[in-house]
Curated annotation (Swiss-Prot):
Domain of life where this protein originates: Eukaryota
Protein name, as recorded: Superoxide dismutase [Cu-Zn]
Listed InterPro entries: SOD-like_Cu/Zn_dom_sf (IPR036423), SOD_Cu/Zn_/chaperone (IPR024134), SOD_Cu/Zn_BS (IPR018152), SOD_Cu_Zn_dom (IPR001424)
Disulfide bond residue pairs: C58-C147
Cofactor note: Binds 1 copper ion per subunit. Binds 1 zinc ion per subunit.
Length: 154
């Protein structure tokens, strides 16, 4: 079992953690998040970005992690970036908790996401359905108010 965590924060009141767990290299990864301080009753994009570099804030994290050269999509789509996690949904206080299982995201092997950055976006991810070139790259999820590098945990 490999476990990893990203402590998410930035130049906003959005903060929290995203925990990853994977039993075997070919097995699925469980992703659990607890994010607070976002807009109330909203859907907000969350992605794994290529670089674990936050020296210039969350912008240094680069584009979505996309080792297979696919277009942007929903977490459940066959055609998507590995880093596409879709939207998290916030409650009336702007908080979001949830768990999903994903077959593309890996902690073990050459496409591991360890050392990369989780970004919580300011806008709703259109899941690549926005009919624009930008939609196919980013989902038009907007600014990056909070992020954190994924690190190995006990």
């Amino acid at each position: 079992m490999v476990k990893a965590v990203a402590v998410v924060r930035g130049d906003s009141k959005v903060s929290g953690s995203v925990v990853f767990e994977q039993e075997t290299e070919n097995g699925p990864t469980t992703i659990t998040w607890d994010i607070t301080g976002h807009d109330a009753n909203a859907k907000r994009g969350m992605h794994i970005h290529t670089f674990g570099d936050n020296t210039n804030g969350c912008t240094s994290a680069g584009p979505h992690f996309n080792p297979h050269g696919k277009t942007h999509g929903n977490r459940t789509d066959e055609n998507r970036h590995v880093g596409d996690l879709g939207n998290i949904e916030t409650d009336a206080q702007g908080n979001s908790k949830g768990t999903v299982t994903d077959n593309l995201i890996k902690l073990i092997g050459p496409e591991s996401v360890i050392g990369r950055t989780v970004v919580v976006h300011a806008g709703t991810d259109d899941l690549g359905k926005g009919d624009t070139e930008e939609s196919l790259k980013t989902g038009n999820a907007g600014a990056r108010p909070a992020c954190g590098v994924i690190g190995i945990s006990a």
